[in-house]
Amino acid sequence: MTAPRVALVHERFTEYGGSEAVVAEFIKTWPGAAVFAPIVSREGHDSLVAAVASGRRGAPAHDGAADDAAGQGISIHDSWLSRAHAAIGGGAHAPLLPFVPRTLRRLPLAERFDVVVVSHHAFATQAVFATDAPVIAYVHSPARWAWDGAFRAQEAGGKPGQLALAGLGHFARRAELRAAPRLAHVIANSHAVADGVRDWWGLPATVVNPPVRIDRFTPDPSIPREDFFLFAGRLVPYKRADLAIRAVQRAGGRLVVLGDGRHRQYLETIAGSETTFLGAAPDHVLLDMYRRCRAVLMPGVEDFGIVPVEAMACGAPVLAVAAGGALDTVRPGRTGEYVEFGDDTAVVEGMACLIRDFDPSRYDPAAISRHAGTFAPTAFRARIGDVVARAAG
């Protein structure tokens, strides 16, 4: 049987995060697939290539940037927006967002592919208007800043930002709703995201949790658990590191904050001597912290959340709010505990109670690590390949 011709569509490769890791696994699932993204930076391109190369051989090709090495491995097709992104300094991509939907609708997909798989955050589903082939959307989340007013206010950073996001949000909602009926199938990265797809798009979704590179994170029984809790991740408002700080203060514990971001300065103003900020750190430092901490704190609502799975792979329990992706990953009493989701005061009080009485010896690190293994990339590739094959007919 001839292998299907697959196109993969992503909104931008300007950094490497969880959604880019998903695309890397898509490429491993369908070797030779063409990859399209309106905005591609050199850093984003190289990070994707490195991630794919870690699992297969083949040199990259970057179409539209400088070096055309077609046929040698990965073919990434970008657009004029890459050059515009570089011209404005290669940093923020937000000024270019209004141009992304139209660019996606004009992708050269017609009559070239048997199935198109899009990696969607806000606009990728616009690719349905560029092809008659079945389009399957892997949804990291419908655009939360477009649909969720509280999230938008939290992330906007002031009235001007809120007004700008409100305008762009109206645009994004219309774009998502226009594309939704044309999708052949929707895959959500968690049950929480599937609920959003149902509520906002009016569509059912199959849940396939994203891959986590747990091979980099393993337990070490020879390392004793120490007397501190860990928050790891980007320091941006929706991650709610502020609640972790307040909960540890209330419980009289110690906290290590690993990560950096625009919210760090504010967090340092509310933290006391109980909190240590280590900034951004390489994997070997993160691994060491996962192995040594009493537990990892997850006070924010994530669409999925990679950090809890990495922590569990190292045998660390996770204390998380009972909402969002944590409902897919944390098993109370076995791999961690839930804090009832509510207002900030309720979350702080609930997490402080868990911290105050927390005993890591109640948990089996080996069992926690085995549970994390269910999110391995190999499991993801098998599941996503099966779902897409059935949906594409």
Q: Over which residues does each language-model region extend?
A:
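Membrane-proximal helix-turn-helix segments that form the acceptor-binding/catalytic region
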Residues: 154-186, 194-195
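Short hydrophobic beta-strand element within catalytic cores of glycosyltransferases
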Residues: 297, 317-322, 330
